[in-house]
A protein has these predicted regions:
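Extracytoplasmic/secreted proteins, especially bacterial periplasmic and envelope-associated proteins
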Residues: 1-8, 30-34, 38-41, 79-83, ...
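Gly/Ser-rich "nucleophile elbow"/oxyanion-hole loop immediately N-terminal to the catalytic nucleophile
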Residues: 1-27
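Sec-exported extracytoplasmic/periplasmic mature domains
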Residues: 7-14, 37-41, 89-94, 161-165
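Primarily recognizes the serine-hydrolase "nucleophile elbow" in alpha/beta-hydrolase
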Residues: 18-63
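Short beta-strand/loop motif that positions the catalytic acidic residue
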Residues: 67-70
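Acidic catalytic loop of the alpha/beta-hydrolase fold
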Residues: 72-78
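Short, aromatic/basic amphipathic alpha-helical patches
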Residues: 82-90
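C-terminal catalytic histidine-bearing segment of alpha/beta-hydrolase fold enzymes
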Residues: 94-166
Length: 166
């Protein structure tokens, strides 16, 4: 249904088919991963946040452009991230990875993003250090708290929207 809606919108409006993007967090991120598996040539780039999927069908991601952001203390998403990294490295992908605290000042996080982008990889992985996404005095799961931090990374958003299909 979502893909039919996308096709209808692209068909109706003046939208550049070379600049379609997907992003999602948790189950929405899982859908973005699935869309990239099922339709490998649809998106110019993707942003996956706090999600995972069976990486055995992700070998073609070696040609994709994406950021994948998780919290280290998330119970599932880092496992999916590591599985995808393993698949990509088996295909000699030049992946870029970084880890930092989500409690760093935003300017420092943006500098970390720029350092990661400067590595020139198509596949970029960011991990927020365990315990850093849960605000002081709050409880809950790192999975849920990681989303806001991921989407506050302006450099990641800017990178995403600079991408176009080649």
């Amino acid at each position: 249904m979502t893909l039919r809606l996308l096709e209808a919108i692209v068909g109706k409006y003046n939208i550049d088919r070379n600049r379609l993007y997907t992003t999602g967090q948790s189950m929405g991120g899982m859908m973005s991963l699935y869309f990239n598996i099922a339709h490998p040539d649809l998106f110019a780039a993707s942003l996956f946040v706090g999600c995972q999927w069976d990486a055995t069908n992700m070998g073609h991601f070696v040609d994709d452009k994406f950021f994948y952001v998780v919290a280290a203390g998330d119970k599932k998403a880092p496992i999916g991230m590591e599985a995808l990294k393993k698949v990509l490295l088996a295909k000699d992908a030049n992946i870029a990875t970084a880890e930092w605290s989500a409690r760093l000042p935003q300017a420092e996080q943006e500098a970390q993003v720029q350092d990661l982008i400067a590595k020139g990889s198509r596949q970029n992985f960011v991990v927020f250090t365990e315990g850093s996404v849960i605000p002081e005095g709050k409880g809950g799961m790192e999975h849920m708290w990681s989303f806001d931090y991921a989407y506050k990374l302006e450099g990641v958003r800017d990178w995403l929207f600079r991408q176009a299909k080649e």
